[in-house]
Amino acid sequence: LDRLAYLEHAGALISAGVVQSYGHAADEYAALTRSTALVDASTDARLDVGGTDAPVFLNRLLTANVRHIAPGQGTPAFLLTSTGRIVLALYALRENEARFSLVAGGVDAATLLAEIDRYLVTERVELAPLESLQALLSLQGPTAAATLATAGLPRPGAPYAH
């Protein structure tokens, strides 16, 4: 079969788990702005940060006050150096009182782990990449809520809810 012929059709071609094409960019943009698009963010780095000191530890490293995020909620934040320079943008998602998931695009899990780990000294914090444990999908667009309802799924109550 001609691989290039498949590229003319909407939808992803997958080879070894990596999307090669989502179709035409104009169709992707139309789905995101006029209807619903399922965005695969599985290549984003995901890191589990847990332990009794996790909220205080992350609060020192991120621009967001993660101590006040309720479980099941999240917030965008920047990871900072000790001098306040931005290292990368990420989302901090609170799983429970002592566990967070950090999600960052444009970087792999090993890099995210190394950036966080360099500031870990005596804190009771455990770090573990989440790459192989789960997929990360995002339903986006103006009709995303209706699509969720049609599928019988609840709409998240707030931005970054999970």
Whereabouts are the PLM-identified features?
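Basic, glycine/lysine-rich polyanion-binding surfaces/domains
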Residues: 1-162
